[in-house]
Amino acid sequence: MIKIKKHRRNPYTTSDEVYALGQHICMSAHKARRIIDQIRGRSYEETLMILELMPYRACYPILKLVYSAAANARHNRGFNEASLIISQVAVNEGTTLKRLNPRARGRSYLIKRPTCHITIALKDLEFEPLDRYMLRPKPKNTGWLGWLKKG
């Protein structure tokens, strides 16, 4: 099972990136990086073609994350999927699951199942930031002596 976590962002932000984070994926980070290096900087459609045709087991969870990030872009920000590119991709090592394999004469061998965390950021090439009039300026923090400066 892949746990997909979505970053909560301000809907009025001027950022043109949308994220999807997959945590505790049962595979080595080294094997996931082999796939990630092939798709970094490519368009969304080209990435889907590459991931569907590559013969590696690591392609399936990465493909699900790319689909999830594109769904986030379409639903949350209203981006067009044809203009999305993969801007940032990161693979970090997760926790290692440790299991015992029983052996002869009461011994046991340790089995280590590595996990990894994959973050995918999609960027829209046709994104136009909001007008500066729509974004409210932050109020000035005058501190507790602000009333002295008024008079």
From Swiss-Prot:
It is found in: Plastid, Chloroplast. This protein binds specifically to 23S rRNA. The globular domain of the protein is located near the polypeptide exit tunnel on the outside of the subunit, while an extended beta-hairpin is found that lines the wall of the exit tunnel in the center of the 70S ribosome. GO terms for cellular component: chloroplast; large ribosomal subunit. PANTHER family: CHLOROPLAST 50S RIBOSOMAL PROTEIN L22-RELATED, LARGE RIBOSOMAL SUBUNIT PROTEIN UL22M. Part of the 50S ribosomal subunit. The gene is rpl22. Belongs to the universal ribosomal protein uL22 family. NCBIfam families: rplV_bact. The keyword Plastid applies. Keywords: Chloroplast, Plastid, Ribonucleoprotein, Ribosomal protein, RNA-binding, rRNA-binding. This is Large ribosomal subunit protein uL22c. GO terms for biological process: translation. One of its GO terms (molecular function) is rRNA binding. InterPro entries: Ribosomal_uL22 (IPR001063), Ribosomal_uL22_bac/chlpt-type (IPR005727), Ribosomal_uL22_bac/org-type (IPR047867), Ribosomal_uL22_CS (IPR018260), Ribosomal_uL22_sf (IPR036394).
